[in-house]
Amino acid sequence: MRVSISWLKQLVQVNESVDDLSERLSMAGFEVDDVDDLSARAQGVVVGNVLEREKHPNADKLSVCKVDVGAQAPIQIVCGASNVRSGIHVPVAMVGATLPAVGLTIKAGELRGVASNGMICSLTELGLTEQSDGIAILDELDESLPPNGSPVAPLLGLDDTVLELAITANRPDGLSMVGIAREVAALTGGSLSLPELDLDPSTSPLTTELDGCFYTITRIEGVDGSKPSPTWLQQRLERGGVNSVNAVVDVTNLVMLEQGQPLHAFDADALEQLTGQPVDAKSFAVRSARDGEIFVGLDDQKRTLDSRVQVVTCHDRPVAVAGVMGSLESGVTASTRNIWLESALFAPPRVRHSARALGLRTDASSRFEKGLPVEMTLPCSARASALLSQEFSCSESGRWVGGSGPAEAGPVLLRRSALHQLLGPLDAADGPEDLDDTSIENCLTALGCQLSAHEQGWEVMAPPSRRQDLQREVDLIEEVARLVGFDRFGAHLPDPLEPGALTPRQQAERRLRQLFCATGLQEVTTLSLVPASEQEQRIAISNPLLADTSHLRTNLWEEHLQICVRNLKASQRGCSVFEIGNTYSGSPEAVSQKAVLAGVICGDRRLSTWATSGKPQAPDYFQARGVLTRVMEALQLELSDRRLTDDARLHPGRAATLVLEGRPLGCFGQLHPAMAEELDLPEATYLFELDLARLLDAATRSNRWTPSFKPYPTVPFSERDLAVIVDRSSAATDLIQAIRKAGKPLLEQVELVDRFEGEQLGDNKVSQAFRLRYRGKNETLTDDKIQPVHDKVRAALSKQFQAELRS
């Protein structure tokens, strides 16, 4: 927000210097980003009168001028502007003057052999406009001119200083000169002299579809779109960072800068030509745009709308994006004579969605997004109408109001005890003392709050401009501290805090990361935004920066494989990575997020050269699967494998569904050879993907992964081998579970040691051999005690799996 000090002084009494005022505003929360001293643009520039103008003897496009600058004798200046002539008053930069806008210091010299002792300036060279057709003619800017030789800065409005304030999202009142004036008055105690507003102008009801907004529309006749604004208005807009367009548009922008309420003017006659119908107040409505509707804004850019965008319509034709920008076809032009003046309160979320959907942010949208008081909508419309009447002698033919604004807020209880407890005592010469009630009341009333007594303190009704910010007791306490001065309160330490700790799930997740790193995998973090895919449906995001980041990812393994590709191309022997991240599925209206643990084991194992005779060795299926086994064993979790054949990314014969506690947890397998060939990856590439939520639930259910001491055995064990022929569909993990159940309590360990397939076994038959370890708790087991248990295991396998015993 650009704040003109001269304009501010017309609204509030300011006795402080610019530096002191900047310091106070910064300490109060309105950080001053920049101080622009406009007088520096015209330092050494004076009013001059062109007495004579002659053609340059050596150049057709140059003129030699005699200029009266209030000195004893006129000075000679060579000028290249085509609009210079005798009898006009112009700004003259004297020798030694510096023009910061163009980075030029004026020196005496010669141009094509003719002496020149100064420069006649354009508005661009004085930093007032971006482009100029020629030199500035002061007679056209003001009828009453100061004497020749007078500084030109006051005439051009350059005798001013502009503060650039950073306005936070919770202070929309800071986006208006009146709001800043109220803040300065509260900080300094200065008196306010604000423009008078008609708080209750006469209106008629508007009964059209308004899509949840408060909307007013005023018919004004007799304006002139070709007329420029008066100089004082243009100067205020320029200092506020707004370009002057014409008197009608400039008035709406002036009210926005002054009061903070954006307004918009429609050309009434253009609307009738555009729609082909007579236009009255009932012709206007507010609705959501239809997908594919075309809108051409005042910036002459063509945009395609969708249902996220809210539009103002005239006879159902979009004429403005609500709260953002009007259309080019309905805008005020030089031929405009009658207007419809819009003043509305659009819902901040709707304006924000519209602006983001179109990638368009304007002065109006930034104000609507922060929230505005509904009480100012009508008065600001009346304020603009009054200013237009002063400029054009135009007349209103009606004002219509419809819709509803936000619900009126009630008072907030401010407890005296809560304020003193939170702020503590003031540092005073006589020792610490609490802030007295009078000071508290003065701070709040200076903000425009209405106070009523309460047994615990005060009931405070915030003014409309601060209602969104002052909703809680702590908000009021902050305002008191801000106005009194944070540095005036003594420092006091907060109550001791108990040290924080990780939750069991956080501990388990951290343990997972440590375990995978200990097995040789590296943790990576990849982007959740990916390109579109022809193989699967992905959720598209709005306004993507790039086509490669236009959708939400559905898996992690695609990017993991790309990481492996890049590493192997960089002459790395192998690449093993894992990641904990989110995947997304569903539709844009109902996005489902799932946390997964995924990774890739690819390429050669990094073993010492003596272990493989100096040759690299790629991991086989069981070695790669052993990585997960070691991690799960450390968490005291047991995974079982089920054959998996319908996953297109995995080898159909070397893939498994991982089962935890009887429910699928994820999958593990070798990358499909076709995909490995397509990506130029080695065959020994393995993928895994686990449901993180289920994994953490199991790991933290009884905290069983916490190490506990078990006594060392004191008696020897006895091993027996058991080979059975079963159907190929029988998983080894199912057989192991049956063996463990039947072998209790003597069975200590069982493992698969051999698997054989052959024609001699029969169709769909396979031989699986297991090694069983038996051990007693306190005695050495004999065959007499082991054999009954071993027979029980055989019987269980025969019964459950129709196993044929081989040994």
UniProtKB/Swiss-Prot annotation:
It holds the Pfam family FDX-ACB. It is found in: Cytoplasm. One of its GO terms (molecular function) is ATP binding. Mg(2+) binds at D469, D475, E478, E479. This is Phenylalanine--tRNA ligase beta subunit. Its EC number is 6.1.1.20. Tetramer of two alpha and two beta subunits. It comes from Synechococcus sp. (strain CC9605). GO terms for cellular component: phenylalanine-tRNA ligase complex. Residues 713-806 form the FDX-ACB domain.
